[in-house]
């Protein structure tokens, strides 16, 4: 059965989402968002435009920022739920960015040498976080156990595991997955679990090795897909998604992607997506950005995926500081034009289900 232009989750099982982790911080640092020249709450705007899933990163005890900790994430979940959007909570299991290049252990756990105690730390932290949100009636619909865990998790600061010790890695990841399972059983809830790998070519080998080492109890495979860092073209993407879906019998979601609408840098913070991120078929323009997103969603649907999330579409320039400078490293790839008072851009139309043909199960 094909449904045209419908996205009610539960009928078509498709998410069109946004990672809004930076919103609280940039608003506190002076950012104002506009739609048709009028000030607007960004959460209200995303919901109004039919965004149905908000992704939020959670750091353990960040020392470089007072955001993306549990208090900040709790506030963000409240904002998302108030607007009727579902939530994907992204546990980084780190005090800072966890990604393919670094998976640094939280400082509070850094002296733990006993693997069982370390695993229990993941379990208790995950479980207690969900208990906190449960008491506030703010449970996420999906929980991500780790962020871009291409390499081995919980490594000493400054070190990168060149080769994954799967006995250790599988035990630790399974403890996070088990915490969600046990929480669901106790509270009769149905929080879904996701594992997340950057780039489809890496997911193909990583999930094979994970499966061989006993990591099986999860519902979602999450992928980052940035053409700048992937060997796969957009046209090749459906094949990889189909392989992952059929081989492991999991739902698939692209949880990170982005495309620039300009190469102009509005502030002194360098922009991560430069001319090397451009694709010939998608101009570096507001319409080109929109075309990229709609094309990507259609390819994701073709591959059997059940969702696409844009990474940090509201990380506009502000007086906020990052580890690398003041401003935004993403201002040319947001859904707002910082050179025009943060006016909303045409790419918001990517949330419009009328752009897609959704196939139901």
Task: Report each predicted region and the residues it spans.
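Bacterial Sec-dependent N-terminal signal peptides
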Residues: 1-12
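Short, well-ordered coil/turn segments that N-cap beta-strands
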Residues: 12-16, 50-52, 81-87, 136-141, ...
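N-terminal substrate-binding region of glycoside hydrolase catalytic domains
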Residues: 12-86, 94-121, 222
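Conserved, mostly hydrophobic/aromatic
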Residues: 18, 46, 90, 143, ...
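Aromatic-rich peripheral "rim/lid" segments of glycoside hydrolase catalytic domains that contact
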Residues: 31-34, 243, 264-295, 299, ...
């Amino acid at each position: 059965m094909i449904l045209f232009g419908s996205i009610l989750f539960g009928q078509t099982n498709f998410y069109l989402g946004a990672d809004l982790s930076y919103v609280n911080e940039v608003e506190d640092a002076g950012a104002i968002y506009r739609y048709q020249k009028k000030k607007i709450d960004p959460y209200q705007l995303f919901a109004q435009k039919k965004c149905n899933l908000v992704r939020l990163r959670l750091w353990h005890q960040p020392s470089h920022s007072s955001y993306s900790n549990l208090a900040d994430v709790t506030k963000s979940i409240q904002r998302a739920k108030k607007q009727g959007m579902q939530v994907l909570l992204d546990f980084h299991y780190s005090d800072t960015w966890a990604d393919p290049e670094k998976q640094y252990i939280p400082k509070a756990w850094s002296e733990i040498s006993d693997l069982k105690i370390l695993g229990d730390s993941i379990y208790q932290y995950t479980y207690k976080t969900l208990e906190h949100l449960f008491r506030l009636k703010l449970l996420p619909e999906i929980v991500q156990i780790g962020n871009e865990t291409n390499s081995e998790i919980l490594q000493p600061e400054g070190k990168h595991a060149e080769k994954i010790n799967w006995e250790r890695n599988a035990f630790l990841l399974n403890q996070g997955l088990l915490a969600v399972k046990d929480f669901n059983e106790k509270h009769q809830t149905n929080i879904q679990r996701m594992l997340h790998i950057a780039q489809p070519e890496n997911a193909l080998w990583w999930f094979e090795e994970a499966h061989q080492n006993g990591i099986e109890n999860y519902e979602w495979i999450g992928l980052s897909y940035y053409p700048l860092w992937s060997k796969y073209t957009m046209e090749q993407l459906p094949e990889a998604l189909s392989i992952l879906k059929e081989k492991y019998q999991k739902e698939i979601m692209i949880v990170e992607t982005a495309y620039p609408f300009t190469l102009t840098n509005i502030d002194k913070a360098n922009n991560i997506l430069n001319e090397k991120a451009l694709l010939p078929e998608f101009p570096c323009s507001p319409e080109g950005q929109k075309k990229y997103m709609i094309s990507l969603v259609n390819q994701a649907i073709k591959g059997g995926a059940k969702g696409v999330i844009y990474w940090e579409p509201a990380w506009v320039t502000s007086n906020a500081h990052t580890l690398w400078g003041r401003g935004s490293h993403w201002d040319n790839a947001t859904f707002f034009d910082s050179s025009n008072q943060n006016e909303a851009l045409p790419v918001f139309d990517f949330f419009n289900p009328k752009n897609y043909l959704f196939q139901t199960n």
